[in-house]
Amino acid sequence: MTNWLQKRVRLSPGETALVFEGKQETFEEIYEAVEKLAGKLFARGIRKDEMVALLGKNDRMTFLLIHALQQLGAITLFLNNRLTKKEITFQLANAEVKQVIVADAFVDKVTSGISYEELQQTTYVEPDLCKTWDLSRTASVMYTSGTTGKPKGVMQTYENHWWSAVSSVLNLGLTEKDSWLCAVPIFHISGLSIMMRSVIYGIPVYLEEHFDEEKITQLLESGKISTISVVTSMLERLLKIQGGSYHPNVRTVLLGGGPANKAVLEICKQRDIPLVQSFGMTETASQIVTLPPKDALNKIGSSGKALFPAEVKIADDGEILLKGPSITPGYLHNEKATAKAFIDGWFKTGDIGYLDEEGFLFVLERRSDLIISGGENIYPTEIEHVIGAYEAVEEVAVVGKSDAKWGSVPVAFIVVNEGFDEGVLKDICQTNLASFKIPKQITIVEHLPKTASGKIQRNKLKERHSN
């Protein structure tokens, strides 16, 4: 297939591609800057099919470098800038990285690498750019969070990114006024997929270095934005300061990272906020299942239905299986994990769930997080939704604790707000949960342990009870 950025420049050179810190740049201007950077990377010895790590942040330079590495045909390993040096070193070694490009702010996190400043000072050499892309080639690698063990490098091909973009547009549609606000990290698939869609659709990315709910709200009220991607914590922060509806041009608030609770859904309905819930993974190149606003309150807790090119089914043991062209071919240098992840062509998500009679997917739990108590299956998310509905609870995580009588019982860890009353919480649990589902212990903590990508590390909470 024709190189996407080169094709986009030929189709719509004068259309806005990037807005960062108030400055607008067209696709033609972006390409000129990308080509210059590609020449400097080429001068540094970076060639097609080489594994190059990128440690950056949500800024113009990182945005340009992602495109420049693609123009050269290099494979980009996206490093999470929140990781420790030890974690980054593991990924660099595991991926057999040839070179590291690192933002000046993060040079202490790598043993050696080319800083952004050093790259800018490099003399330009005319690069050998890719005119076409083999869709089966690996474009990017991202390591999973490793909540239960060592992270694995997820390979994402150009085909994966292409079909992710096509699936999204078939679901959400496309208009000439569209633009995508990106305040999620571009080293995660949620952010990178926005960049890919921008080029394929020909729409601008409004890139934000940090999530500032007041600034984001101003943008959503300005009429400049049609779509924004958020996770639950970001949405909740927006709702706390948002008093009315957003500008009518905002037609999609795409939520990832788990379904919204009823309270959030009702606020969104009252304020005419077009919330689209989704389910996706690094392995699926972003969203693969979505729930539109019209179904949100009727299907509370559901992630929706599979996007057009994708399929979903439930295995005999309750595991959610996926199939589709956006799904990874496997894990980098890990044939064993790749083989284990697929069964008869279906990708094993590791999540437990079910399809209701209308085909809507409900994700219940990670298989490893399921609590089996006296023969009863207990899903932590069910308990978390009940506890999380109490406004004095900021965050909650439920895990299983070994029990001599029942095998395992649920216990809860909570972060509380002012006004918390344990008696009120116990009443809520007794009213809404079967007795065997009520946490046998509730521990108040200052914060929940999380990975660099914000996922709760349940294994660390389990360790607190096993020690």
Curated annotation (Swiss-Prot):
PROSITE patterns: AMP_BINDING
Pathway(s) where this gene product acts: Quinol/quinone metabolism; 1,4-dihydroxy-2-naphthoate biosynthesis; 1,4-dihydroxy-2-naphthoate from chorismate: step 5/7; Quinol/quinone metabolism; menaquinone biosynthesis
Keywords of the record: ATP-binding, Ligase, Menaquinone biosynthesis, Nucleotide-binding
EC assignment: 6.2.1.26
MF terms in GO: ATP binding; medium-chain fatty acid-CoA ligase activity; o-succinylbenzoate-CoA ligase activity
Source taxon at top rank: Bacteria
One Pfam family in the UniProt entry: AMP-binding
SUPFAM superfamilies tied to this protein: Acetyl-CoA synthetase-like
Known catalytic reactions: 2-succinylbenzoate + ATP + CoA = 2-succinylbenzoyl-CoA + AMP + diphosphate
InterPro entries given in the database record: AMP-bd_C (IPR025110), AMP-bd_C_sf (IPR045851), AMP-binding_CS (IPR020845), AMP-dep_synth/lig_dom (IPR000873), ANL_N_sf (IPR042099), MenE (IPR010192)
Keyword Nucleotide-binding: yes
Any Gene Ontology biological process: fatty acid metabolic process
NCBIfam families named in the record: menE, PRK03640.1
Family listed: Belongs to the ATP-dependent AMP-binding enzyme family. MenE subfamily.
Described function: Converts 2-succinylbenzoate (OSB) to 2-succinylbenzoyl-CoA (OSB-CoA).
Protein name: 2-succinylbenzoate--CoA ligase
Organism annotation: Listeria innocua serovar 6a (strain ATCC BAA-680 / CLIP 11262)
Gene: menE
